[in-house]
Design a protein with these regions (language model features):
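Membrane-interface helix/loop caps of multi-pass membrane proteins
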Residues: 2-17, 21-260
Length: 260
């Protein structure tokens, strides 16, 4: 499935149809390494690790996860916009295939290894609990599972699932499923004008960010556990990254780096 991209680059051969890619001799610029993005990602990882290790002074290190969501929104939106502007279309199927190839093998390997280790170390009682968590994590719904189970992310007492960190991967994958479809819908609604598409994309993102942030504030006060794991209360972070990608995309010859 494809959608016509927002514009043709100056001096490039005009596209002849909705699914037309670059013409002969028109190389498509590839994503480049972004040292600043990788550096920010490293800082976020370190903050989360120090928080989990209970290092004094890093009790708020969990905000590294928020930074990750902003980075994800920035990179994925940047790749989609870049593909549209350089190829004249967005391949939804290709996007999903790349996500599967990049995420599924390692994710599945860690899941299987963790479940087996849980049975080996903790016996059937622990193994069964971790296996149940793994079943949800395998379909990228760990965040929904932990929210429904009433898991308190900030309460480290009692049993803590070794797969609890899969909740953030669930939020990201849910975003990856829906966001390209929304971009596709915007492209179909405003198929004739690149400027209209860009403005509509920004408008949709602003509404998404404001609504999600308001819902996050409300839910955090009334249901903090659900608010922590919910994709609806996290959408504003991904949306901010997406807004940055759209704002910085004009005139860029390379897609955002980061190996997405």
């Amino acid at each position: 499935m494809t959608v016509t991209g927002p514009r043709t680059r100056p001096h490039a051969r005009p596209a002849t149809g909705p699914g037309t890619g670059p013409g002969p001799g028109e190389a498509v610029a590839k994503p480049r390494f972004r040292a600043e993005v990788e550096g920010l990602r490293a800082v976020a990882v370190l903050a989360v690790a120090l928080d989990h290790a209970a290092v004094p002074g890093f009790g708020g290190g969990f905000v590294g996860v928020d930074v990750f969501f902003v980075i994800s929104g920035f990179l994925i939106t940047g790749l989609l916009v870049h593909e549209a502007e350089t190829r004249g279309r967005i391949s939804i199927g290709g996007f999903y295939a790349r996500r599967v190839r990049r995420i599924l093998p390692l994710s599945a390997f860690v899941l299987v290894l963790t479940v087996l280790a849980s049975y080996a170390v903790g016996g059937s009682a622990i193994g069964n609990r971790v296996a149940a968590d793994g079943a949800w994590a395998s379909v990228f719904l760990a965040n929904v599972h932990f929210a429904q189970s009433g898991v308190d992310y900030f309460n480290r007492g009692g049993f803590v699932s070794p797969l609890e960190h899969y909740w953030s991967l669930g939020v990201e994958e849910q975003f990856y499923v829906l966001w390209p479809l929304l971009i596709l819908a915007i492209g179909l609604v405003a198929a004739s004008s690149a400027r209209t598409r860009r403005r509509l994309t920004v408008a949709v993102l602003v509404v998404l960010v404001v609504a999600s942030l308001a819902w996050s504030v409300t839910q955090t006060a009334s249901s903090p556990t659900a608010a922590y794991f919910s994709p609806f209360t996290r959408a504003w972070e991904l949306g901010i990254g997406a807004l940055l990608a759209v704002a910085l995309s004009r005139g860029r010859r390379h897609a955002p780096g980061g190996g997405r």
